[in-house]
Amino acid sequence: MDKINIRNFAIIAHIDHGKSTLADRLIEECNGLEKREMKDQVLDSMDIERERGITIKAQTVRLMYTAKDGKVYYLNLMDTPGHVDFSYEVSRSLAACEGSLLVVDSTQGVEAQTLANVYKAIDSNHEIIPVLNKIDLASSDPDKVKSQIEEIIGIDASESLLVSAKSGIGIKDVLEAIVSRLPAPSGNFDNPLKAILVDTWYDTYLGIVILLRVVDGVIKKGMKIVMMSSNAVYQVDNIGIFTPHKKIVDQLSVGEIGFITASIKELSDCKIGDTITEEQRRCDNPMPGFRTIHPVVFCSIFPNEAGDFERLREALKKLQLNDASFTFDIEVSNALGYGFRCGFLGMLHLEVIQERLEREFNLDLTATAPGVVYQIISKNGILREVHNPHDFGDVQDIASIKEPWICATIMVPDQYLGVVMSLCNNKRGEKVDLSYSGNTALLKYRLPLSEVVFDFYDRIKSISKGYASLDWEMDGYMDSEIAKLTILINSEPVDALACIVHKSKVEQRGREICLRLKDLIPRQQYKIAIQAAVGSKIIARETISPYRKDVTAKLYGGDVTRRMKLLEKQKKGKKRLRAIGNVNVPHNAFIQALKIID
């Protein structure tokens, strides 16, 4: 295939601005699917994506388009996620393309994730075509949005395309702009094979599948290839593309995006961003690869059935193959047994992984409180990174504790600016900058990550009636007053409920968890004491009263000492029961107790 007729492009936008709907219309216009096969969000293959109306995994599809100049062009479309938790998926997709369609909702304008994604595209040297979507709505204001694009982002918006992805207006113009304004891929057909590994996933029938972009040379069926980071050698079994159906082809050459299978058994050989080359004729230098991504939110996941531990381990391995940003290690809990300490890019990422484990692998799970990575410096100068409360150590040995901070970009209509700033201040935030574009405020704040990951996104959306948008990036570590909060039930610490909290909020958090547990733990035959402690100091307590059997019911008058004797006997029995019995704590109590409302 002549690379002159190839166009590789990504669709980038803020969440809910219509990326997946635009992808549907492009597929429909290019006859990628028959009318009877078309459905909304056709590239969103997971049920969870359809139900939530979001894209989680970047998807690729090759389309054939006959342009006005009479030539047939091959368009490789990458539909990318819009939520901040999946920004790593966006970065990978952009590395495989030369251009981007920047989709902006013409009723909403530029939002925070629009900025983040377009800057990623600029860093990738992309040609960018602004596309203003939803122009058929009465509240659409294309001129205002063009001004915003030029003022806030700093790119020319004079030739922005006006479309309605839902009704199909302007789709032909988008396709013509792709072939006329976006560059063809560079690279040399005669050079040794050089391909970048963009994504991997597990297929029940094919095993490990690799999505790649050929930069130089050609890859053919039967060729022996090398993973340059590990020097692992494999023979290519199958080569294919998505149209969006899987279609087997003989080869992929310069500029093409497709998938291969090669009977790969070792997950460690498939590193996202690795360079693939031919064993007999290796390329000189590997590609730069992708920026290593590190999880920022951690929580423990336990199977509710002890026998499901191995099933959970296998499920996590398969999900990790499909999502390199997700990590896990074995953990043992006194309360919940064997499980895994898992790392995520944010709370939505955590929810999606847990939901996929439960749906796709039919597992019943309990997740503990999410937390972030703290740096603990001991008195002898040793630095430890801790994300698990169990590893906090003795307070007497700690010289200082640092917590991660972020730089948040918040875009909000000016009428909601006051409540948003108030929320940021309540979350221990520090204002960095405030600017305006029309009646939209662009707010920059530094905030502790621990205050952001749990419910900050939902709270911002709620107080701004859905109009505010948020993006953030890591901004280093700062000294902080941090304490480990321990929850005790009948004087026994419950490790699954331990959490690391800022000292200014430790009493409030302790009281709230105790109150929640009081509502969630059923009454027993003996009194249950629920306590929150920092070190040896009890900071909150709630008591669950026992059931009381009326042991004196059979008495009718007579000596009062008989009554006292029966009550004393009941008291001794309950004391013995309390000493030998375990408190029955329902599994859902753990996660419910930690869903604290500010």
Swiss-Prot record:
Entry EC number(s): 3.6.5.n1
Membrane-crossing residue ranges in chain numbering: none
InterPro entries, sorted: EF-4, EFG_II, EFG_III/V, EFG_V-like, EFTu-like_2, G_TR_CS, LepA_C_sf, LepA_CTD
GO biological process, one term: positive regulation of translation
Gene3D superfamilies: 3.30.70.240, Elongation factor 4, C-terminal domain, Elongation Factor G (Translational Gtpase), domain 3, P-loop containing nucleotide triphosphate hydrolases, Translation factors
Keyword hit for Protein biosynthesis: yes
GO cellular component: plasma membrane
Record's keyword terms, sorted: Cell inner membrane, Cell membrane, GTP-binding, Hydrolase, Membrane, Nucleotide-binding, Protein biosynthesis
Topological type in the membrane: Peripheral membrane protein
Molecular functions (GO terms): GTP binding; GTPase activity; guanosine tetraphosphate binding; ribosome binding; translation elongation factor activity
Catalyzed reactions: GTP + H2O = GDP + phosphate + H(+)
Subcellular location: Cell inner membrane
Domain of life: Bacteria
Keyword Transcription part of the UniProt annotation: no
Function: Required for accurate and efficient protein synthesis under certain stress conditions. May act as a fidelity factor of the translation reaction, by catalyzing a one-codon backward translocation of tRNAs on improperly translocated ribosomes. Back-translocation proceeds from a post-translocation (POST) complex to a pre-translocation (PRE) complex, thus giving elongation factor G a second chance to translocate the tRNAs correctly. Binds to ribosomes in a GTP-dependent manner.
PANTHER family referenced in this protein's UniProt entry, alphabetically: TRANSLATION FACTOR GUF1 HOMOLOG, CHLOROPLASTIC (PTHR43512:SF4), TRANSLATION FACTOR GUF1-RELATED (PTHR43512)
HAMAP family tied to this protein: LepA
Membership in a protein family: Belongs to the TRAFAC class translation factor GTPase superfamily. Classic translation factor GTPase family. LepA subfamily.
Protein name: Elongation factor 4
Source organism: Ehrlichia ruminantium (strain Welgevonden)
Lineage: Bacteria, Pseudomonadati, Pseudomonadota, Alphaproteobacteria, Rickettsiales
